[in-house]
A protein has these predicted regions:
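Alpha/beta hydrolase fold serine-hydrolase catalytic domain that processes acyl esters and thioesters
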Residues: 3, 12-47, 52-66, 70-112, ...
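Gly/Ala-rich beta-loop-alpha elbow adjacent to hydrolase catalytic centers
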Residues: 193-197, 201
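Catalytic cysteine-centered active loop of the rhodanese-like fold, especially the PTP/DSP P-loop
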Residues: 188-190, 203
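Short glycine-enriched nucleophile-adjacent loop
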Residues: 201-210
């Protein structure tokens, strides 16, 4: 983990071309500011999942030792001005992520969450970059959040390895992490992620052991890359297909990578092209994403 104040040039293709997305009139931040139902009244939706998937992007400091245990720490304890720079250093939208954290800790739906079992690992030898956390919800359920692609050569190289290998190191690690998280959970298990994190969430939900699989209520992939033909034709995947909910923006490029795709729904975005990968650009109407009729021409071409 990098210390606050360190500077590392971003190697992410998206980060290099990114300009701040036009703020959606209604996005996940305004959703948190306007929707106050408890999770007992209205359960986890794909909009909620995108919020919780983004939590795994925060890079916790070494002093946050409680967050690395099964008991965890209150998520409100993350909201410290002296931590903001380190939490978001090198990420795609530091200001947006700080704003999101403030909205989470103010939200009646999520402000009592505990952040548990945070891990962040990089292995240059196996070309693995992996980070995840478990969010203990006020209902007694948990949401396992897998981080998306980090702005590093290792992170992007592993993403491209997914196009050619049926099981890359971070996918194997995600399965083990999910099984451990489920063993500590009292209630149902939700799992999700954005970008590569969505791929890891779907893969782990499909390939975990039967005891864990029986606990999973839903798995969410938010513009996560797809899978090889071998993975999608496996018995484990076919058994799990009904649990997996994939959302992609209309001009999705990242989520349409790889030879075949699982089923998905399409959402509207305020950005264009590859910038639609930014979750803050996804439009929310009320408590749901604004659905699009289908993919744009470029994204549809990638899906063929």
């Amino acid at each position: 983990m990098q210390r606050a104040g360190a500077t590392t040039p971003s190697t992410s293709p998206i980060a290099q071309v990114r300009t701040p997305a036009p703020l959606a009139r209604n996005n996940i931040v305004t959703y948190l500011a306007t929707q106050f139902d408890s999770l007992d009244v209205r359960g986890i939706s794909d909009v909620d999942s995108l919020v919780l998937a983004c939590v795994s992007y925060y890079q916790l400091p070494d002093v946050a030792t409680a967050a690395r245990t099964p008991e965890g720490m209150p998520i409100v304890d993350l909201y410290r001005a002296d931590w903001f720079e380190g939490l978001t250093l090198g990420l795609w939208d530091p200001e947006g992520l700080v704003r999101l954290l403030g909205s989470i800790v103010a939200s009646p739906r999520f402000r009592t969450i505990r952040l548990c079992d945070y891990v962040s690992e990089t292995d240059f030898g196996s070309e693995q970059q992996f980070s995840a956390c478990t969010l203990r919800l006020p209902t007694g359920d948990v949401y396992v959040s897998f981080r998306g692609t980090a702005n590093s050569i290792v992170g992007w190289k592993e993403d491209f390895n997914m196009a050619f290998e049926t099981r890359v190191p971070s996918q194997s690690r995600a399965v083990r992490y999910l099984e451990r998280a489920a063993s500590f959970a009292e209630g149902r298990v939700y799992v999700g992620g954005h970008s590569k994190g969505g791929n890891l969430a779907a893969y782990a939900a499909a390939m975990c052991d039967q005891a864990t699989h029986a606990r999973i209520a839903a798995a969410f992939s938010h513009d996560g890359p797809g899978f090889t033909r071998e993975t999608l034709s496996s018995p484990s995947w076919k058994e799990s297909a009904g649990l997996i909910h994939k959302t992609v923006p209309r001009s999705s490029l990242i989520g349409m990578l790889f030879e075949q795709q699982e089923d998905f729904s399409t959402v509207e975005s305020t950005s264009v092209g590859v910038l639609q990968h930014d979750p803050f650009s996804w439009i929310v109407d009320g408590v749901e994403f604004r659905r699009a009729d289908g993919l744009s021409g470029g994204a549809d071409f990638l899906d063929r």
